[in-house]
Amino acid sequence: RDFCLSRGLGDVYKRQDESFADLRAIRERYPDMKIVLDAATTFGCPFDGVVTTEQVVAYLEKAREAGITAVDLCDTIGIANPLQVERLAGVVLEKFPEIRFGIHIHDTRNMGIVNTLTAIRSGITRVSTTCGGMGGCPFAPGASGNTSSEDLVFMLDQMGIDTGVSFEKLLETARFLKENVPANYSGHQMNIAPKQCVMG
């Protein structure tokens, strides 16, 4: 089973070197554990501002040295744009072929689905999403949740890309959540009335 561990690119809560020392200790104690490292604020930080490609590469080099083989590139505050995603994905996929990359995009500025699609078309095949786009970010007030699971699966289905995931079940889950769990939702499909806005 994968264990997901989030570490930011900056030094706001803990110095990066300390974070990677902790990570190496976890790796040494649990050598068989599959760790997915969430590289928080990859595309921009609410505290440090712009994050450069060079900073991301340096961070990933430390992750590789710590024995990490799976990393999610996280747009924690929903600031990324498709060109930025495409360029960064191209660089890291070339420089770190031994790392399995995923993408984790927040939909704060309504660019979650296009940024996620850009990552997929750039060669990233694992994505983080949430039903209904539910969620937010505790240190970025106003940030939306991740790209909506059902919105993304609907789009990929329409494009002929098989995800192996049921759009109908995701939609049912998203509507249930919205009715029963007070939260911030950025999804669109769950707001369409049944049998409306359809073809045929």
Regions found by a protein language model. Name each.
Residues R1-Y13:
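Single conserved hydrophobic/aromatic residue that forms the stacking wall/gate
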Residues D11-G200:
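Catalytic cores and adjacent flexible loops of soluble metabolic enzymes
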